[in-house]
Amino acid sequence: MKESIFSKKRILLLGSGELGKELVIESKRLGLEVIAIDRYEKAPAMQVADYSRVIDMGDKNILKNVIKEFNPDYVVPEIEALSIEALKELEDEGFNIVPNARTVEITMNRDKIRDLASKDLKIKTAKFDYIFEFDDLEKKADEIGFPLLLKPLMSSSGKGQSLVETKNDLQNAWKQAQANSRGKVKGVIIEEFINFDFEFTLLTVRKENGENIFCLPIGHLQSNGDYQCSWQPLEIKDSLIIEAKRMTSRILNNLNGAGLYGVEFFIKGSEVIFSELSPRPHDTGMVTLVSQNINEFELHLRAFLDLPIPHIYLIEPSATRVILSNQEYLNPIYEGLNEALEFEKTKVLIFGKPVSRKGRRMGVVLSSNSDIYLARKNADEAARKIKVSTT
């Protein structure tokens, strides 16, 4: 009898948040062994993994040592705050970095992915520049014009991002970007504010053979760069989707690593404007847990494990709305679950984070309906029923 390819496969997950948790669950369904790594104990993915370890992932030697200790078949980054030098050296030594170390490096730094898209591939983006000293900021802000966006070169989930209305706001925005910057780079990206009509995510699966497979577009809303809600499918003109797919293919053909990518775009009139790219399951893609026949987490696994990916189709229009905490609690509890679960075709996912903070994402509501408007309405109303509290 032929041995299952999964009988000895081991995945090491770098970052163990809510997206990592869903990836671990899908991995366990395929019989894989998973090690979850993060910088704090009891992170969501650690609660369902086979093994876990708390380390400083930004320390090259510590990260290399723990990866060598567990000797995984695949190293799967879930966050940006880690030592890229360690990943590059380990890849040279024969470890499989998903999708590859170069892609992780390019996408974890806003300057590198913007340079690749705008300068190398001539893909339309917002006007931008990089600033490393505050004294240079005011002059560049005048060139780009107000309002504008200021972001750390390296951060995640919109942390440190500010909408700057006037010169008087530059100092506070600079301080916020510096305080929320991850890694050793303390520069910022100053970016034209685009008064877009809407924005969306195009989940794209890159197979080992170089084929790109596209999911239906996902609409989403953000606040200060952080995802608040999403829905699939998004009503959008075919011509705009064709252009977004063309842009995505050009970028992924350059990065060339198997896995799932979350590619974000702005739409302004007839223009498609590239925004950001993540080489892993995407926040907005949590809607696929109920909307698609194969969710984004399983798609990521199938892609880098080189497993078949049959036709991806919509089961039913669906929507999400995040559950946010309004203050800090240790071992938080959740009130209103009974009321939230009274909504038809609605699920609640509690991430299991051990500590809540003001504005921290603690869970998500998923709702389906043949009418996308009702799916969004039910997700919104159910989420409002849930309050993060403490005993």
From Swiss-Prot:
GO terms for biological process: 'de novo' IMP biosynthetic process. GO terms for cellular component: cytosol. It holds the Pfam family PurT_C. Gene3D superfamilies: 3.40.50.20, ATP-grasp fold, A domain, ATP-grasp fold, B domain. It is an enzyme of class 6 (ligase). It comes from the Bacteria. Involved in the de novo purine biosynthesis. Catalyzes the transfer of formate to 5-phospho-ribosyl-glycinamide (GAR), producing 5-phospho-ribosyl-N-formylglycinamide (FGAR). Formate is provided by PurU via hydrolysis of 10-formyl-tetrahydrofolate. This is Formate-dependent phosphoribosylglycinamide formyltransferase.
